[in-house]
Amino acid sequence: MNQLSQTFVLANEFKEGDLNVGGTRDDHVRREARGALAALSLGEIAKADFVEDQVTEALHRSLDPQLAGKVTHLTVADLKQILLSPEGAGWIERHRNGVSSEAAAAVVKIMTNEELATLSCKLFNPLPGDGIAIGSQGHFGSRIQPNSPGDDEDEILLSILEGLAYGCGDVILGLNPASDDVDTIIRLERLLQSVVERLELPTRFCVLSDIVKQTTARSQTKADVGFQSLAGTSKAILGMVALDVDGLLALAPGFDGLYFETGQGSAVTNQAAEDVDMVTLEARAYGVARLIQQQTGSWMIVNDVAGFIGPEVFRTGEQLLRACLEDTVMAKLHGITMGLDVCATFHMGIGPAELRTLTEQIVVQAAPAYLMAVAGNADPMLGYMTTSFREHPRLRRQTGRQITSAMQQRLIELSAMTESGTNADALYAAYQKAGGDTRSLDTLRDEGAKKIRTLAERGFDLGYGCDENHTRITGIYTNARRALYATLDEAVISDSSPRHFRAHSRSLDRDDFLAHPATGELITGEDMARIQALYPARRPQVQVVVSDGLNANAINENLRWVLPGVRRELLAAGHHVSEIDIVIENGRVRAGYHVGSLLEAEVIIHFIGERPGTGIDTLSAYLTYGLDDKGQSRWGSAAGFDHSWTTAVCGIHRRGKPPERAVEEIARLVARMFAQRCSGVALQSALGW
């Protein structure tokens, strides 16, 4: 780490994630670093390459040399003074392409929360549109996020329609697919397209797969908006999509619109930070987005997912608020139309009431263009808390802002939008009629209402209106917190794995495991030796590992229906599968990599409980091929093993990805790993996914 990078990380307001790159809890050290940072000139910062990679090259290319020359003499303190002055908004609009991404990071580091809020509330980057447009000063919109743990079309459709009834979705309908194969992407793109076109909605739609798979899907269906997660280093981007910035630039022009997601913490928790702090990495991601927009001229939005990872990044509501303010200001300084996903995982310790209060504060202080909107406060597929449909009418009233004029007019025409969100059945009838259904409107409304009731009975947060007594999120939160402390059922383990070895991670107890994730990534020294002694002769090609993860209930509920079937399929295919499975208490995903390094296994299949909060206890399987293309072990250090080298099969549950389908998928993927001698993004690339 060079001196400038060190000054940048020490100048940050404290967040746990920065401890990975040299951050400190010491207030005195941080104050001194902010003083040193304030005295630096923008020219000094612009000359420094924080990382030698394509992201840095992209940041240089995004700058206008003439404008950069005009601001090079300014110190970071000068920039702060200008931005907070009455002329600040006009000044940055004229000079933004001369201000480097790292300079944007520097200036927010030396601002208080109050100063960040003052600045954010006078910076707006609207997209084209008549009347109140996305990102304009009077606008506050949303992305409907209609996720389904099994990609069920009725669940997705009814979730969208109820969201529309609350006035949500004016920015985009954006679905995270539970299964990320191209066929599923095509099917879901067509569903979203049918909603937009049948109801003649003035909004966009997107299935949030990566831009490579979307490009493949686009040859068979309309993909309205291209999606990609961005990051502040090439290493992080390559780990997500096996493309660097130039690869993204090659694919982006194929889409009429672009939607990027970012968020502090992803690079530092995946060993891809390159010694750069979280705020600066986030600013660098915005610089990449700026370059792509400059080169494509596309309609573009960015969404900062703040709070999605867990307590290893943010532990308190104050940190979440700070991150949202920092990120919104930095994005606006780049000229980006910026939204937020103000969210919390169930193991952070931020409860539903606190998150609602934080959301209100952030909407007022950060003035984002939009937030997420889900059927209930808990996403039924991703397992975290965010903003519900029901909150949006209240947030619009509190801020005095509204959805786009075009969307408001269309929802009025459809007689759809109410404060209580109770007209989803009417929208269902209109949707069916537009698709050619000849039944009466009353019949269709009754059918829509019945489907909503059925989904509610199955646990979906639909059809309740704004009933103040509806407390399902409280129950989900309580159950999720309880699930974090669940233990593995020995009967389930014995039934699923008659021969197994019980191992322990280095977590002292469950609280240590939750608070310090790294302790769950390595096996204890005593158990390491025992694992290495399990196979004195021939070691298996495929080693099965089982960990409780964040939810042992997921193992207890699903393992019996998956592990024996996977073993049968692999043995039938002629693979040498472990006679002794390794079961880890307080195990994280990387604990599976550690087992791989101890046994030099060719393939690790690691079954682990997904984090709770979806309303169902879902299981994941992480499949990792441990040899390189020369047949040499790539396991190395478990702590440094790249997550991009693994392939995940997620959402395994009878109400998500059915166990029998998961068994088939795991067996098929393992066969492809042996054939291609790789896994993760390399396997996707080899298979043209």
Regions found by a protein language model. Name each.
Residues 118-122, 136-137, 142, 182-210, ...:
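Alpha-helix-loop-beta-strand connector modules within alpha/beta enzyme cores
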Residues 1-126, 437-452:
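Long, compositionally biased, glycine/small-hydrophobic-enriched stretches that function as flexible linkers
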Residues 50-55, 124-148, 260-272, 340:
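N-terminal small/glycine-rich loop or linker at the start of catalytic domains
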Residues 95-98, 108-112, 171-189, 304-317, ...:
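Glycine-rich, proline-tolerant flexible connector loops at the mouths of alpha/beta enzymes
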Residues 117-119, 139, 458-536:
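N-terminal low-complexity, intrinsically disordered segments
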Residues 280, 294-295, 301, 611-689:
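C-terminal functional extensions of proteins
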Residues 200-203, 297-302, 335-337, 405-408, ...:
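Flexible, glycine/charged-enriched surface loops at secondary-structure junctions
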Residues 216-375, 379-387, 396:
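Catalytic alpha/beta core domains of metabolic enzymes, predominantly
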